[in-house]
Amino acid sequence: MKYDIIGDIHGCLQEFQNLTEKLGYNWSSGLPVHPDQRKLAFVGDITDRGPHSLRMIEIVWELVIHKKVAYYAPGNHCNKLYRFFLGRNVTIAHGLETTVAEYEALPSHKQNMIKEKFITLYEQSPLYHILDEKRLLVCHAGIRQDYIGRQDKKVQTFVLYGDITGEKHADGSPVRRDWAKEYKGTTWIVYGHTPVKEPRFVNHTVNIDTGAVFGGRLTALRYPEMETVSVPSSLPFVPEKFRPIS
């Protein structure tokens, strides 16, 4: 099986359409379909900050849950939206406010439909996907070699948030260790979460979050070809979001 793994979309629907078309997908049915049966995989954070979060929920639900032709691994923004939909007490900030604004503008029956679809998508998707006979792992923020196969709280925190130190940058975002430098496994780890100006290959890991929602690009990794394909963002460039990885 061949995969096209998509970086953090964050509601950037137009960029997602442009990228999938560049990858050879046809949208005539209203969904991206590849003539060679390549499958899409999403590294999470499909919502928040961008303009079309709810449409992205519908598309990914349709591909992953209804048609079962794609893979989705949730990100930290997905986890927070899930908790919001469950009625938990979450802070409506850091991008969630854009998704909530879209949601609250809907009539109640459409709200219920979106909520049910996202809850189903989240609950029926694993923390990470192991594909191609363990040669490939798709997740949100990365995973240590010794965590592969585990699902406990410590691993969940790492996979959703990265290797956080507990310290904060001046803008309140967490300081993260560069776990990829220490990774010695042979399974390819494809992930996103931390915006980088160019796809970042380190050992057998690839960060494909090139900051579409911050005016960078939306990037896919073609597997097993190990080629990256990108399209430019239509949004304003926010340089401070592309912080060097320490």
Swiss-Prot record:
Gene Ontology CC terms: cytoplasm
Name the keywords, alphabetized: GTP-binding, Hydrolase, Nickel, Nucleotide-binding
One Pfam family from the record: Metallophos
Q: Gene3D superfamilies in the record, alphabetically? A: 3.60.21.10
Task: Give the E.C. number(s).
Answer: 3.6.1.17
Molecular function terms, GO-annotated:
bis(5'-nucleosyl)-tetraphosphatase (asymmetrical) activity; GTP binding; nickel cation binding; phosphatase activity
Substrates-to-products reaction catalysed = P(1),P(4)-bis(5'-guanosyl) tetraphosphate + H2O = GMP + GTP + 2 H(+)
Q: Does the keyword Hydrolase apply?
A: yes
Q: What general EC class does the enzyme of this chain belong to?
A: hydrolase
Specify the superkingdom. Answer: Bacteria
Query: What does the record give as cofactor?
Result: Ni(2+)
**Role description:** Asymmetrically hydrolyzes Ap4p to yield AMP and ATP.
Family stated for the protein in its record:
Belongs to the PrpE family.
- What NCBIfam families has UniProt attached to this entry? PRK13625.1 (NF010148)
UniProt protein name: Bis(5'-nucleosyl)-tetraphosphatase PrpE [asymmetrical]
Q: Which gene encodes it?
A: prpE
